[in-house]
Amino acid sequence: MAPPAAAPELGSCCICLDAITGAARALPCLHAFCLACIRRWLEGRPTCPLCKAPVQSLIHSVASDECFEEIPVGGGPGADGALEPDAAVIWGEDYDAGPIDLTAADGEASGAGGEAGAADGSEAGGGAGGAEEAGEARGAGAGRAAGAAGGRAGRGADAAQEFIDRVARGPRLPLLPNTPEHGPGAPYLRRVVEWVEGALVGSFAVTARELAAMTDYVMAMLAECGFDDDGLADAMEPLIGEDDAPAFVRSLLFVAARCVTVGPSHLIPQQSAPPGGRGVVFLDTSDSDSEGSEDDSWSESEESSSGLSTSDLTAIDDTETEPETDAEVESRRTRGASGAARARRPAERQYVSTRGRQTPAVQPAPRSLARRPCGRAAAVSAPPSSRSRGGRRDPRLPAAPRAAPAAQARACSPEPREEGRGAGLGVAAGETAGWGAGSEEGRGERRARLLGEAGPPRVQARRRRRTELDRAPTPAPAPAPAPAPISTVIDLTANAPARPADPAPAAAPGPASAGAQIGTPAAAAAVTAAAAAPSVARSSAPSPAVTAAATSTAAAISTRAPTPSPAGRAPAADPRRAGAPALAGAARAEVGRNGNPGRERRPASAMARGDLDPGPESSAQKRRRTEMEVAAWVRESLLGTPRRSSAALAPQPGGRQGPSLAGLLGRCSGGSAWRQ
């Protein structure tokens, strides 16, 4: 028997949710299902899975309008005009108590078999002609037992063969070969495959692969030959053997018949089926008098096939609350608070009409409220609470007016804050001016207003310090001394004495003291003495002669005319041509030699305002100070004139005292030539 063909044009089966295989239609609704699926469904539910209508028969293998097969479901007459006897079980999944005992016979059959055995025994005893009665009795008993055993065996074999023939003739499920994975072709054939495997393992010593191949061969031959015992025996002879093939085939067909049979007793529709099994029922609203008992019985039912109860339907005009009587009002007043609350509850079938009323839609609270502080969450108006019938809405507080930006700035300004509680005032002012204003600002503004307009405490302290610095009175800057044009490089290092710079151009003589002219050794000595005056003043015991000489030399320099600068150079562009910057650079070099670290130097703004503490330097100030130090070092070390070897050595501690400044000045003023 070939496997049933698939019918994809019919769609999918609503039972197995797969493509319909071996299409079968249920009568009278004509819904299509798989033949195996609908038979399994009808085993316990004689109704259509889709419309719940009772199924009378199944139509399958339809070739044309005249060529098809019909399987009666509702206990219809069989081929011989009589009802088929009750079958064993369906699907082969419900008989866990073991195989059916086909050798068991009823009392009448047993009696008949016993009588037949007794007759045979008496005949045998009469034919033997034994003289002794004991021998006759033993012979009669043995003949009776043999006759009973033969009768039971013959009746059992006949019953098994009759069962196989009846299943082969009647409605049954198809026999299918195994799958490529060596599994049963259908779930109901699992018991057949298990029986075949057990029989082969008991007869042959095979491996798992050989057992799977032999089982596939047996199931393929069973699906091809069906219940044809002669053809199946011929197919099994090469595998089982000629002697054992008939018994194996008979047992195989009996097990297969039990698995594919469909018993009519399992398909009889229930007598007391609920109204839900009637399928689709159309409600007739016409005023016809042809209403039978069926309609009356249907109206008594509370539920239809769709689960809708029409007894609960109420007209829209009848949904108003019934007014309470005087007795009910009096009893409600006397029952107290608990009784009143219980009486105000609506009854089981009490309806409230909402016609003509607009119930405000409850707006869900925004998700951002979960991330806001408690103050703001409380300030946001809550959605309207549900009210009972006849009640009033809860009074809503008026919204707080939004403060103007100027008012918010005044409330959060640093003026009213004191030294110890600036952050607290900022938070309070931010909550007062910001959280009740609304939710139009962004997340950054909400965070700033949560901390106050002044920000976190670190930012508040910085702003407060800057405010104090800005409001502090700035002292008037000291007038810078006019730069005196000099032409001598001042070097205050210990090993380099004062030396003249590049040869200065000749200039017209001016009113200078002692008739000294610019460019002469005397003028150079005077300039050197004027430049060395600060260093001499810092010494421990300056001599009066040196002080007088330095003073007279400085006066002589201040009264002379300015020296013209070389061609192509501005007078103030070169730091060596300006007296004040050179002195400042020398002072910085001196401070560095004295051991004062650069980090402890105060910036110019702090030195101008010595009474205020500028606090820690910022990164920009540190970078600016470093740049200034590097520029000063470059001017002093790289841009200066290379030092020349000098005979005058710096005084060593503990050594001989070197020549003094007065001696040098006297030597230069005496007209001696300048020694390199």
From Swiss-Prot:
SUPFAM superfamilies the record matches: RING/U-box
SMART domains listed in its UniProt record: RING
Record PTM: Auto-ubiquitinated. Transactivation activity is possibly regulated through phosphorylation by casein kinase II.
InterPro entries referenced in this protein's UniProt entry, alphabetically: Znf_RING (IPR001841), Znf_RING/FYVE/PHD (IPR013083), Znf_RING_CS (IPR017907)
Protein's GO biological process: protein monoubiquitination; protein polyubiquitination; symbiont-mediated disruption of host cell PML body; symbiont-mediated perturbation of host exit from mitosis; symbiont-mediated perturbation of host ubiquitin-like protein modification; symbiont-mediated suppression of host cytoplasmic pattern recognition receptor signaling pathway via inhibition of IRF3 activity; symbiont-mediated suppression of host cytoplasmic pattern recognition receptor signaling pathway via inhibition of IRF7 activity
This protein's record includes keyword Transmembrane: no
Chloroplast recorded as keyword: no
UniProt biased composition (Low complexity): 304-314, 375-388, 397-411, 555-597
Bias-annotated ranges (Polar residues): 351-361
Listed name of the protein: E3 ubiquitin-protein ligase ICP0
Protein's organism: Bovine herpesvirus 1.1 (strain Cooper)
